[in-house]
Structure formats: C-alpha cells, structure tokens
C-alpha cells in the first residue's frame, strides 16, 4: 500500500467511535477480534456504514466462530482470518476468493510448507491434533545469540516448531486448537482449553469463555 501511495489511517489506539468515523472512507480494515466485537456493540456500526469496505481482516488472536457468524449477520462481510507469529510473519490465510470457514486460519501461503506433527516430529494423520511446524523463506534464522534455544526450536529438516496445537484436514486447511504448554491431561486424555471453550461458547447466554487448567 505504501509503495503504491495508497492512503492509510494509523490510529494511536482503538476507539470504536474513531474507527466508525473513518470507515466510510476506507476499503480494507485490519484488526484483532476484540475490535470487531466492540464495533458490533456500538449502535452506530451498521451494515450501511460498511458499504465501501471490500475486506475485513483479523489476526493476532483466535477469531471465535461466533464472532465470525455474528459479524457476517451484522454486516454481510465474512472476516478473513489469517495466522502468523513473530518468528515467521504470516504463514497461513483463509482465501481472498473462496470459502472462509469460521474457526480456521486457512491454508499455507505460497512458498510456505506447514505440517502437524507429534512429539517426535512425525506428521500425524489428517484431522489429528499435533504441533504445527513451518518452513519457508519467511521463517527467521534463529534467536539472537541463543544457539541452544534456536536448536531446540528447529527440526533436523529445517521446520520451525511453533508450539501451537493444530489440526490440518485433507486439503490442507488449518485449525488452531491451543498452545502446547496449555495441554491438560485428565483421566489419561489430552484436553486442550480451546476445545472446552468452543463447547462453552455455543451455550445460550455465553459471549466468550476462558478455560484455565
């Protein structure tokens, strides 16, 4: 956008009224999920206000399926959720042209290879939960002056171990289910807080939940 001279609005902090003031003059908005829930709680945020918008993008935190569906009902727009991290920038995205599925972060970006593996770095079957690993030109080379940590975070074949638990379906669509360190073992079963939160969040009267174990 900057190279093409496209005007951009950088706000010092999120303020729903200030965002609403700018919306009629912009075509793309990027934000975290909380921005979108707060906008929907603001009476002035209407479908008509979004008439000029081509695309709403979400990242930096998981977008609840309920927020995705509520935003679509409110505005007619399906938020494009994507996934990345400081060590790799963006690695996956729902398609710009194509189906955007609530609760997923889409497919690996061009040039990026993603896989879901077990604790021994062996790829798991489609639909099974494991640790998301990534490889590509966007992935960093290592932690500054921390060779031991760098070695522990990369596999022998050059994949960075993200620490995010995920599933990947047969066509490569990725769903993030939690963090590896958040795993709770109950009755011999692996339980991920995100899975419990998803079950609670669909209950009537629940806007959002947080599970800590």
Language-model-derived ranges and their functions:
Residues 44, 52, 111, 149, ...:
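Glycine-centered tight turns that cap/initiate beta-strands
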Residues 21, 32, 84, 120, ...:
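AMP-binding/adenylate-forming catalytic core of the ANL superfamily
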Residues 94, 106, 125-126, 141-145:
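Active-site glycine/GP-rich loop and adjacent strand/helix microenvironment
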Residues 6-24, 191-196:
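ATP-dependent adenylate-forming carboxylate-activation enzymes
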Residues 3, 8, 23-31, 40-101, ...:
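Gly/Ser/Thr-rich phosphate-binding loop
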Residues 103-109, 123, 154-157:
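Short Gly/Pro-enriched turn/cap motifs at secondary-structure boundaries
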Residues 42, 157, 200-203:
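Acidic-histidine catalytic/liganding microenvironments
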């Amino acid at each position: 956008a900057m190279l093409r001279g496209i005007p951009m609005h950088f706000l010092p902090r999120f303020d729903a009224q200030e965002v609403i003031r700018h919306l009629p003059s912009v075509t793309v908005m990027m934000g975290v999920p909380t921005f979108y829930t707060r906008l929907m709680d603001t009476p002035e945020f209407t479908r008509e206000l979004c008439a000029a918008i081509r695309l709403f993008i979400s990242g930096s935190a998981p977008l609840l399926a309920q927020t995705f569906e509520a935003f679509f009902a409110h505005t007619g727009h399906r938020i494009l959720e994507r996934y990345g991290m400081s060590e790799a920038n963006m690695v996956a995205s729902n398609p710009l042209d194509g189906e955007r599925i609530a609760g997923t972060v889409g497919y690996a970006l061009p040039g990026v290879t993603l896989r879901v593996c077990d604790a021994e770095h062996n790829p798991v079957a489609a639909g099974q939960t494991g640790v998301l690993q990534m490889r590509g030109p966007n992935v960093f080379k290592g932690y500054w002056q921390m060779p031991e940590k760098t070695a522990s975070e990369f596999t022998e074949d050059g994949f960075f171990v993200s620490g995010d638990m995920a599933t990947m379906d047969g066509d490569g669509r990725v769903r993030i289910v939690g963090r590896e360190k958040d795993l709770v073992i109950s009755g011999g079963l692996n339980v991920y807080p995100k899975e419990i939160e998803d079950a609670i969040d669909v209950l009537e009267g629940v806007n959002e939940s947080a599970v800590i174990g």
